[in-house]
Curated annotation (Swiss-Prot):
Name of protein: Tsukushi
InterPro entries per the UniProt record, alphabetical: Dev_Immune_Receptor (IPR050328), Leu-rich_rpt (IPR001611), Leu-rich_rpt_typical-subtyp (IPR003591), LRR_dom_sf (IPR032675)
Organism annotation: Xenopus tropicalis
The keyword Disulfide bond belongs to this UniProt entry's keyword annotation: no
Principal subcellular localisation of the protein: secreted
Length: 350
């Protein structure tokens, strides 16, 4: 039922009107249907103050904004009652929430998007969001030191999630065998304190962002069990000095690899790219790599473009030689490179 509401939110011709609301809040009603027979309400209570909770909301509320209110505690009793059972989107960002429990969001059975960014959360209990139907979860800019994968397990595992854990203080990500592996599609871990690539084995990730962590080395089996990964960002790692050979060999589906802005990374071996048969985009801009391996293309059969140096962009193209009486026309793959000033000979790059 909830997904059909989301679809209706974008139907052309819907009519919005205001209605009576909790003091300090604004309630906007969106009407749907030929005779406006169906409606959903968006409630904006941002910046009202900590006294706003618990807030009474209309029965047909789909969106509730409680951001920037200085809220310190949030629990099940605050997020229950008439109106809360239909919530699809809840914004609790820019508050002072220190903790949540496994029951805090247990009554929000149709919740799909939850923003808890810019709070003071230090821990996440296992099953924190178990009874929701989350597809988007923002936990960025909190005070998290370690995170258990079990926190993101949902009772209904059919829908994939996008999770943002960026800009915390995360040093480790641990997992237990007691819960099913969560269905996480995209995971952002940028701006944390990770010293090594966390064990994410078996999670059906397609996007992984590890930018701005103190990683010094990418080990050989760092990405084991992530065969479905298509986009990997390892940019702006100030301590990264080494990427081991065969580090990415377990990523046959990877399309995009970002290793830009890593000034301590001075060289790369061709074996580092072994197994990247699907890779199309490689970003090495503003890294410390002086030149690319001459046989780099042997391990990158699907490569379309490489960005390198201070803005050198190389694209792979097929060059056809003039017709030869015995050989006919010979076709070969070559790199064509250029920067902001014009063409750059490929031999200066390789």
């Amino acid at each position: 039922m909830a997904p059909s509401w989301l679809f209706l939110l974008f139907i052309p011709g819907m009519v919005g009107s205001s209605r009576s609301c909790f003091p300090g809040c604004q309630c906007i009603v969106d009407n749907f249907g030929l005779f406006h027979s169906f409606s959903l309400t968006k409630v904006d209570c941002s910046g009202v103050g900590p006294h706003v909770v618990p807030v009474s909301i209309p029965l047909d509320t789909s969106y509730l904004d409680l951001s920037a209110n200085g809220i310190k505690r949030i629990n099940e009793s605050v997020l229950s009652g008439p109106g809360y059972t239909t919530l699809i989107n809840l914004n609790l960002s820019h508050n002072q929430i220190v903790r949540i429990s496994f029951s805090t969001f247990s009554k929000l059975r149709y919740l799909e998007s939850l923003d808890l960014s810019h709070n003071l959360l230090e821990t996440l209990p296992d099953g924190s969001f178990l009874y929701s139907r989350l597809t988007e979860l923002d936990l960025s800019s909190n005070k998290l030191l370690e995170v258990g994968i079990g926190a993101f397990t949902l009772k209904s595992q059919g829908r994939s999630m996008t999770i943002n854990l960026g800009n915390n203080n995360i040093r480790s990500i641990h997992r237990g065998a007691e819960r099913p592996v969560p269905n996480i599609h995209s995971l952002t871990l940028s701006g944390n304190d990770l010293l090594s690539v966390p064990d994410l084995h078996g999670i059906p990730l397609r996007h992984l962002d590890l930018d701005r962590n103190p990683l010094a080395k990418i080990e050989k089996e760092s990405f084991l069990g992530l065969e479905g990964l298509t986009h990997l960002s390892l940019s702006d790692l100030p301590n990264l000095r080494e990427v081991s050979p065969y580090s990415f060999k377990t990523l046959p589906s990877l399309l995009d690899l970002d290793l830009s802005s890593n000034p301590q990374l001075k060289s790369l071996s061709s074996d580092m790219f072994f197994g990247l048969d699907s890779l199309q985009e490689l970003n090495l801009a503003y890294s410390g790599v002086a030149a690319l391996p001459k046989d780099i293309m042997l391990n990158l059969p699907s490569m379309k473009s490489i960005t390198w140096g201070e803005n050198i962009r190389c694209s792979k193209t097929v060059k056809e030689s003039p017709f030869h009486a015995q050989k006919g026309r010979v076709r070969e793959e070559v790199l064509l490179c250029h920067d902001d000033y014009g063409a750059v000979p490929a031999q200066d790059v390789l």
